[in-house]
Amino acid sequence: MPELALLEEVVEKVRPLLGQGKVADYIPALASVDAGKLGIAVTTVDGETLGAGDYLEPFSIQSISKVFSLTLALTLYEEAEIWSRVGKEPSGHSFNSLVQVELERGKPRNPFINAGALVIADLLQSRLGAPKHRMLELVRQLSQNDKVCFDKQVADSEYQHSARNAAIAYLMKSFGNFQGDVDTVLRTYFHYCALKMNCADLSKAMLYLANRGKSITGTELISQVQTRQLNALLATSGLYDGAGEFAYRVGMPGKSGVGGGIIAVIPGELSICVWSPELDGNGNSLAGTAMLEHLSQRLGRSIF
């Protein structure tokens, strides 16, 4: 376990970067977040959690939820059913691109861009009677926090600005790769993105990625092989168009969200969550990436 002093050092090291990024403003409910927040939490495979900075302040997890939705799909479907509808390759296009969906005849490149996550939400919608409730159950169980909830204001705000995601869903539907009612699936998808959690919650919830598929309670969520495969996808596609840069600087599987959170994993050791709302040009937390880079260097850890 890293010492508390190291986590505090990491937070202070990146503080001068504040003001260099830009808070997501295309979702009005996210635009009002205090840009000066910085938090980090780590959870070890022994179940111990440590944090520094604003690590107990809840934020909108946004695309980090795509890890939970894919994990949930892996518990409900045969893998062939999932991967026949969504690929495993980095996209090279923006996360909300329509161009690639058109060129590749409705099959998204990976489950972590919007098109891929919408297919996963479609799969969950068709197999679960109450997909929103099931997701809430899962993240509460994984984080050991019954207070985790959806931020209805954020979900509604995203739904009111959902033209592009609706266009992606209808385009995939035209190719036969979207089964459900678009409006219903979009509402489920936006609720997932609007989950509100803090760094401690997320570092605990993602521990299964560091612990061979076993959650903080020791329950097996997915198999050891599936965990390794999921980490591989996170390493290649978890950071939008910044995945290569992140692999170079941080060297860990990770997933970001436009709420400013990033989760990262050192397999066999610990899971990490950082948060700083200001984003870089790829939509990844600017100071958050720097915190992970500094931590990785100080711990001497990388999967490469």
Curated annotation (Swiss-Prot):
Keywords, comma-separated and alphabetical: Hydrolase
This protein's record includes keyword Hydrolase: yes
UniProt GO BP: glutamate biosynthetic process; glutamine catabolic process
GO molecular function, one term: glutaminase activity
Record field: catalytic activity: L-glutamine + H2O = L-glutamate + NH4(+)
Residues that, per the record, bind substrate: 63, 114, 158, 165, 189, 240, 258
Pfam family, one: Glutaminase
EC number per UniProt: 3.5.1.2
Keyword Nucleotide-binding annotated: no
Complex formation: Homotetramer.
HAMAP family: Glutaminase
Record-linked NCBIfam families: Gln_ase (TIGR03814), PRK00971.1-1 (NF002132), PRK00971.1-2 (NF002133)
Entry similarity comment: Belongs to the glutaminase family.
Record protein name field: Glutaminase
Gene name as annotated: glsA
